[in-house]
């Protein structure tokens, strides 16, 4: 089975305190589902001037497979609701090759 990668791109952090609390609570849930953080941070640069404005924060996590990633985020639903309105974010899962 192919690994899965969850990518979260935070275009805007509206409420840093909500994000801080979300991250503290979510780390335990994600870890319990085998998540491995590959990249977390806000030190983001464009590759070229044509790429637009870089996000304020980005996260990449590795899971054993897509199903494990989906289960982790289903288990984390209560934390997701606490983050509501705290960030503008796009999050998706990509199956590895």
Whereabouts are the PLM-identified features?
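C-terminal structural segments of small proteins and small subunits
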Residues: 69-87
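C-terminal end-helix/capping segment
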Residues: 84-97
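Short S/T/G/P-rich N-terminal loop/turn motif that feeds into the first structured element of a domain
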Residues: 1-70, 95-97
């Amino acid at each position: 089975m192919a690994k899965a990668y969850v990518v979260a791109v935070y275009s805007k952090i509206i409420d840093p305190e909500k994000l801080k609390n979300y991250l503290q609570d979510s780390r335990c849930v994600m870890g319990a589902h085998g998540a491995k953080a590959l990249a977390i941070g806000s030190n983001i640069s464009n590759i070229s001037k044509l790429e637009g404005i870089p996000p304020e924060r980005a996260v990449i996590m590795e899971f054993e497979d897509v199903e494990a990633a989906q289960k982790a985020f289903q288990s984390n639903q209560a934390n997701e609701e606490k983050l509501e309105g705290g960030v503008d974010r796009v999050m998706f899962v990509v199956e590895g090759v």
